[in-house]
Amino acid sequence: MVQHHTGALRMSEFVFDIGQPGVGALAKQIWRDQAQEIKAMGQWRKSWYPEAPVYPAALKTGGDPNSIESLERMSAAHIQAMQMMGSTPTRDNRVTWFLEGMIAHHGGALVMAHDALNKSTNPTIRRLARDIIVAQRREIIELRRMLRHDGLNKPEYHQFDALFSF
């Protein structure tokens, strides 16, 4: 999840200086929220799982989500995918790139939050997952509003709607 959040930080930085229609302000808010969550996740890892690796890790296919032995080091390609580093915007397309990219990013967060709800018994993790679902739903709706303002309304903007509820 930290790698996923790092992607949001990088994407947001491309549009900090954009004023229309509140894109820069939204990007700065997303950056602040994601940075705070990265810090919290780091503190939880140290407190709850001091023996867990500090390098980016993922659950092995079929692995037990409650076992550190089921973790494996993320490949460079996996890290790049989590950080959504597949493309770089141009000056002309960076607003649409950011808004569409954040819908995809938030959709990934919804998938991971539902996964956490399905697998975790930790009340703090479950609360975070529910908070993420509520926040991501709200932001996806705002991102779509901003895209509609620019005359864009593609079917893929709605691909995560089924994940808006618990």
Show the residue positions of the predicted features:
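All-alpha RGS (Regulator of G-protein Signaling) helical domain and cognate RGS-like helical scaffolds
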Residues: V2-F166
